[in-house]
Design a protein with these regions (language model features):
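Soluble FAD-dependent oxygen oxidases
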Residues: 1-167
Length: 167
């Protein structure tokens, strides 16, 4: 059944998949199209997933959000396309290395099929170099704003725009 639901309800619809406290590692990327080759990489990856808790979320972008100019807000990637979110989860802390390696290896195998952009909310803490991709054409402007309003980088516990970095 398809129906309109309030945003808070939609935003919690998959909470049951994410047990509180369960270790996990995410990687995500935009794709202009989901080619047969990319789908093949995903099928192979999930055939060798380290646990049965690993997930793939595919989000469709575009529609009404695509009518906003890329420079109107900090978020520029409004054109149609897909965002894939690889989620590796495990219950035994001893499986951490394998879970993280699986997500990274799968992400690397998908690289030839990815668009050159990233979704800010899904960047893991170790993906500093992709922050520029996440903000795209707005990155240099955001660095200047950060230098002006947060030169000491007080607000850095996020997908950080470092004011000390050259724009």
């Amino acid at each position: 059944m398809i129906a309109r639901v309030p945003y808070p309800v939609a935003n919690t619809g998959v909470d049951w998949l994410f047990e509180r406290g369960r270790p996990c590692y995410w990687k995500s990327a935009f794709f202009s199209e989901l080619s047969d080759a990319a789908i093949g990489v995903l099928a192979d990856a999930f055939a060798r997933a380290p646990t049965d808790k690993c997930l793939l979320v595919i989000e469709r972008f575009g529609g009404e959000a695509a009518r906003v100019e890329p420079t109107a807000t900090a978020y520029p990637h409004r054109e149609a396309g897909h965002n894939l979110l690889l989620i590796s989860q495990w219950t035994d802390p001893a499986d951490s290395d394998a879970g993280i390696a699986w997500a990274r290896t799968t992400f690397d195998a998908l690289a030839p099929h990815m668009a050159d952009r990233a979704y800010t909310n899904y960047l893991p803490a170790d993906d500093h170099d992709r922050v520029r991709q996440a903000f795209g054409v707005n990155y240099d402007r955001l660095v200047e704003l950060k230098r002006r309003y947060d030169p000491n980088n007080l607000f850095h516990l996020n997908q950080n725009i470092d004011p000390a970095r050259s724009s």
